[in-house]
Amino acid sequence: MSKQPSLSYKDAGVDIDAGEALVERIKSVAKRTKRPEVMGGLGGFGALCEIPAGYKQPVLVSGTDGVGTKLRLALNLNKHDTIGIDLVAMCVNDLVVCGAEPLFFLDYYATGKLNVDTAAQVVTGIGAGCELAGCSLVGGETAEMPGMYEGEDYDLAGFCVGVVEKAEIIDGSKVAAGDALLALPSSGPHSNGYSLIRKIIEVAGADIESIQLDGKPLTELLMAPTRIYVKPLLKLIKETGAVKAMAHITGGGLLDNIPRVLPEGAQAVVDVASWQRPAVFDWLQQQGNVAENEMHRVLNCGVGMVICVAQEHVEAALKVLREAGEQPWVIGQIATAAEGAAQVELKNLKAH
């Protein structure tokens, strides 16, 4: 008989019981998000989903994303209840810009040591995000990987699939000079620019838990979940048929994201004076002495989504968006780009 102790998976740092406890806790979360097209529940090897009825030529649209180093801030603040909303938002907002209705979502959660309470908070947030987007949480992977992550640190990735009618795909090809650009407000930095944000906090030596801006704690402003624009935008598309292009303003800000949906020869002229920049961005700029152009190249500066419609559809589009609970405004228009000109021109940039 060997005197060597009998090793288990738990001795190696993997707690199967904790994983099973998590699955039990999140089953009700997934159930709340279920769409009629989804077949079966959590726990199968693969998730099955029918194409919704009514599509003539359905095209599937897929996307994947994470939440960047906003996750580090969440870990530092021990605030895990809304980061799942961020994860869903980053994926579904990318899908809706081509006119797609999100169908289902999966997540990947990797950690060095599984904390069931933390993971359950994260997945509950993912469920809340799925409800806001109208898509089903159909499964995911929870990987406990000792030696790969420090302690209970974790990483997140999301995956989403949506569907759009082939004839109704929005791809920016019809954008023309004279078209109007509408904007929808962000809730804050959303899920982008957090490496710069964290550097600013570090260099400024700021105690973000004691700072208030406009009567709100700075931590609340920095951790505000990314807005999910799916339902208002699908309503806009359905009721007006007027949307020519949409840009989700993520990493790269207005300067890098609007060109992704512009045809060659088109230039977006954006009036920076058309909206009041939220105080959190002014605080970040001041504390980090960040150049104005850099602000717009890294952060959304208060704009989460840009929508292109013909001038004759502006009032109808604004009306539908307001009815959906949004606060849209006209942010600029499309011009013909001069030879060698940038595809986005920012007007009325304040001197810094």
UniProtKB/Swiss-Prot annotation:
GO CC terms in record: cytosol
Superkingdom classification of source: Bacteria
Cellular location(s): Cytoplasm
Listed CDD domains: PurM
Keywords: ATP-binding, Cytoplasm, Ligase, Nucleotide-binding, Purine biosynthesis
Stored InterPro entries: PurM-like_C_dom, PurM-like_C_sf, PurM-like_N, PurM-like_N_sf, PurM_cligase
GO molecular function, one term: ATP binding
Signal peptide limits: none
Cytoplasm among keywords: yes
Protein name, as recorded: Phosphoribosylformylglycinamidine cyclo-ligase
Native species: Pseudomonas savastanoi pv. phaseolicola (strain 1448A / Race 6) (Pseudomonas syringae pv. phaseolicola (strain 1448A / Race 6))
Lineage: Bacteria, Pseudomonadati, Pseudomonadota, Gammaproteobacteria, Pseudomonadales
